């Protein structure tokens, strides 16, 4: 095993302190809150459009919260791996939201949101219903996730580096 592998193993085996856990938990909760705000906006859109969100879509949408929930679990258990799960959560969730709403989802499971925001702004026919309208609130609550996730990722990576350097310095 190389020195860097031993250092990484030591790092991953070390519990984070309360202050560090609190710091990255705030960022993780900010990512979750941004995702929740975005999903709340979908409810607002559905009401505005008189669109009934199918039950299976509610269930499938829970997948968005898997990574932030895993991050929260790891943070609460003071695991040093929580730094990177917060980073992963921010990147994956932001990328997925942007892909679905600016381009097209990979699978057609998102109901009316199988159409991107540009098409929805012009109007689309979906299951016999004409749906039109994307406003500034929709755009703001789409972009809130990357706006929160980018600083969350940077802060988590920076804190990880500081924590690891401190650990390795104290261990020598």
Kindly give the residue locations of the regions a language model identified:
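Interfacial segments of alpha-helical transmembrane regions
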Residues: 17-29, 79-93
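Cytosolic juxtamembrane helix at the C-terminal end of the final transmembrane segment
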Residues: 150-171
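Hydrophobic alpha-helical transmembrane segments
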Residues: 64-67, 125-150
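Membrane-interfacial helical/loop segments at transmembrane boundaries in membrane proteins
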Residues: 109-129
């Amino acid at each position: 095993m190389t020195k860097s592998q031993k250092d990484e193993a030591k790092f991953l085996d070390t519990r984070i302190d309360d202050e560090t856990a609190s710091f990255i938990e705030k960022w993780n909760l900010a990512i979750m809150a941004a995702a929740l705000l975005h999903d709340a906006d979908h409810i607002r859109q559905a009401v505005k459009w008189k669109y009934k969100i199918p039950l299976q879509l509610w269930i499938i949408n829970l997948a968005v919260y898997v990574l932030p929930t895993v991050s929260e679990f790891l943070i609460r258990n003071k695991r040093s791996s929580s730094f990177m799960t917060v980073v992963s959560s921010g990147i994956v969730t932001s990328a997925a939201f942007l892909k679905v709403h600016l381009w097209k989802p990979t699978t057609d499971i998102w109901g009316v949101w199988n159409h991107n925001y540009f098409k929805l702004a012009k109007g689309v026919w979906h299951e016999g219903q004409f749906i039109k309208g994307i406003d500034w609130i929709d755009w703001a609550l789409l972009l809130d996730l990357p706006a929160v996730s980018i600083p969350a990722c940077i802060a988590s990576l920076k804190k990880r580096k500081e924590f690891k350097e401190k650990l390795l310095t104290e261990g020598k």
